Amino acid sequence: MFKYLILLFGTLCFSQELVFNNLFDSTLNSKIACYRIPSIINSTNGTLIAAIDERNNSCGDLKWNRDINIVLRKSYDDGKTWTKIEKIIDYPLGESASDPSMIVDRQTGDVFLFYNYMNLDIAKDVYRFM
């Protein structure tokens, strides 16, 4: 009987419907080739923050793309709704940022965003971590 109670409990826990949202859809903007390398965190106040590469002109990686920005969206209601896309890292053409990674300091509530940077006009093949 104990086995069946565990099975029933597990069934009840996972009976909620899964909902999938496409937060970053490149087909909605002809200037964007693709979105890649997502990062998502849950802040100490419950805000979900999703960041991602916005790759313009091509889907090429940092070394091959002169225009990669980092954008984000936030949700204040557990992912039911999301803010509009906000561009947070946007260097001049020839300088790009990619591969966002976020961490939360649970003591202070601060959110840190790290990313790769490359200036393709001055130092191609030199990655800097910001």
Region annotations inferred by a language model:
Residues 2-13:
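Sec-dependent N-terminal signal peptides
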Residues 16-130:
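Asp-box/BNR beta-propeller blade signature and adjacent active/binding-site loops
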